[in-house]
């Protein structure tokens, strides 16, 4: 209803101003600005729904102030360009319409009415309401009743008798199991769901809507609200350190806790969270690659579900035979947005919907088959009678190719329990949320029936039942939950440990690199993660007077304040204010101690603008003083005009990447010498080793041969045509995820470059 009212007010404002208001520059500018704001808000809402499937939420707020990177980002580039072009066209059309009667005299009454209607359209829009609520959630002090509802359970389970298998299905929401909406999509796992305790109304709340957040909510009974973006949790050294979570209780009760997944454990800080709360045995892509049958059988995120669940079954057998009480948690990945992945062993590789194949539905059908196979192995084993199996989604599906069909249904998370000790078949339609999952499991295992804000759905009352406005209530508790992190409020001294790549201050520890905004009463950590912008881009968003401490590789800050460190990959510390003074210190000891030294100086806006502009220079446009191209730092020597076909810097150098160009091409600002030696320090990847690699300058071509280890080769060139471009053509680029950023599409690697130097020859 509010959408229609908002649009009606918008349309009325446009018509009244266009036909009645007449000519006046101020009223035209004011009305166009407000109407333009209406357009921007609604396009933001549309775009947010496209990315998150949940309107304008915390994730959108973070994305708007940082960058969108991660899995499948290329899928969103065209829609993003379309939105920008559409926005430009709408603004142009809006301005043209409003100025149609610019030759008529100005009418104050109609101008005022049009402006008021425009303001009303903004106020009535759902986008404005969502943003207002989001901003309020960032600035509240908390809710006084939080302590009354947040309850810590007993730290142990008296006389535990059951082992636990807990399966997180990536984005595998209960909506997929509606056989009327999606016929025969989930027959195997759906049949198992119908044999157990099926909780049919598990809603998703703020702070529980992505993987690590869903895990925290289900194991600790709280949403993942933090003084930083949740997926950047890999930078912290402990995770809600004061909270009692399900893993803590299991460990205290004699359980050995195991976690198995196909992706890298470091992503989003899953390793930190699990280690902080009772899990001593963790297996991710790095740990599994030496034990799986085929270490090359991987998707963009890691190992496929069939591989992961096979390893989980082996671990279940091993632990069951040992007689040791255990919990085994596993997380699938094949149903990750935007398209999902199809394991090669499943029978259900294709699912048609609306008369055509749908990749996301196909991935769901395949993954549920793999999960069902794993569960049926457990059920057929002699140890099932001592086991509780839990299957849940980590969160609702995000914007995938099935999303528009899911949105037509009543969407809920998946949560069902199969008890080997006491089979029960029942569908429970009680209102609940993800935070109730851990408390329900704890209750089944013989522990308390509450865990944080979670309550057992078998013997307690969920917050979703107590509060009709549970989403708003959850956001009201956000400051209280953030305080559970026990983050420091001041930073005066700090220590950097180079061996551990950590910084410590006021009792807190963080992984490097790290950016901190420091005020009188708050220290705000801004870690770098797969989903965040580089720290220098985050720093560029600081106000002129914001105090900062930035710990990063020296070359990243050298172009601003320490050009002598432009080629250093050591750690450096910079601090100060973007509009004031800044200092850079080289971390030259294994354990390095520093102090904050912020000065209350006069703010220079010209300096501030210059710093911000420099911070925002993209990597490939950075230039440094050097007589060679050093590939383990960002940018290129000053003599280089542009380059292509080269991947990002890594600690040793850079790979060529055929996804960015079939050739490595380095164009210099001036012609290369008439006679020169090209000194190349490099290595080859895969089948490119021991193969002739063409290297061209103008019409002359030489051959480079590399092995899998780094070597230095000198090639002799004559350049009579004054060519200014060096071209290297890897013969057989290999598609691989080796060394790739988690969730990104595979790179096509050819040669790995450490240094390229042009040395002029006499004569």
Swiss-Prot record:
The answer to whether keyword Transmembrane helix applies is yes
Task: Give the membrane topology, semicolon-separated if more than one.
Answer: Multi-pass membrane protein
Question: Which Gene Ontology biological process is one annotated for this entry?
Answer: glucan biosynthetic process
Q: Name one GO cellular component term.
A: plasma membrane
Q: Known SUPFAM superfamilies for this protein?
A: Alkaline phosphatase-like
| Keyword tags | Cell inner membrane, Cell membrane, Membrane, Transferase, Transmembrane, Transmembrane helix
Catalytically driven reaction(s): a phosphatidylglycerol + a membrane-derived-oligosaccharide D-glucose = a 1,2-diacyl-sn-glycerol + a membrane-derived-oligosaccharide 6-(glycerophospho)-D-glucose
- Looking at the UniProt entry, the stretches that span the membrane are 1-21, 26-46, 77-97, 108-128
Q: Which Pfam families match?
A: DUF7024, Sulfatase
Give GO MF terms, alphabetically. Answer: phosphatidylglycerol-membrane-oligosaccharide glycerophosphotransferase activity
Give a yes or no for keyword ATP-binding in this entry. no
The pathway this protein participates in, as annotated, is:
Glycan metabolism; osmoregulated periplasmic glucan (OPG) biosynthesis
Principal cellular location given in the protein's record = membrane
Q: Which Enzyme Commission number(s) are on file for it?
A: 2.7.8.20
Instruction: Give the location in the cell.
Output: Cell inner membrane
Q: Report the sequence similarity comment from the record.
A: Belongs to the OpgB family.
Q: What does this protein do?
A: Transfers a phosphoglycerol residue from phosphatidylglycerol to the membrane-bound nascent glucan backbones.
Q: What is this protein called?
A: Phosphoglycerol transferase I
> Origin organism of this chain?
Escherichia coli O17:K52:H18 (strain UMN026 / ExPEC)
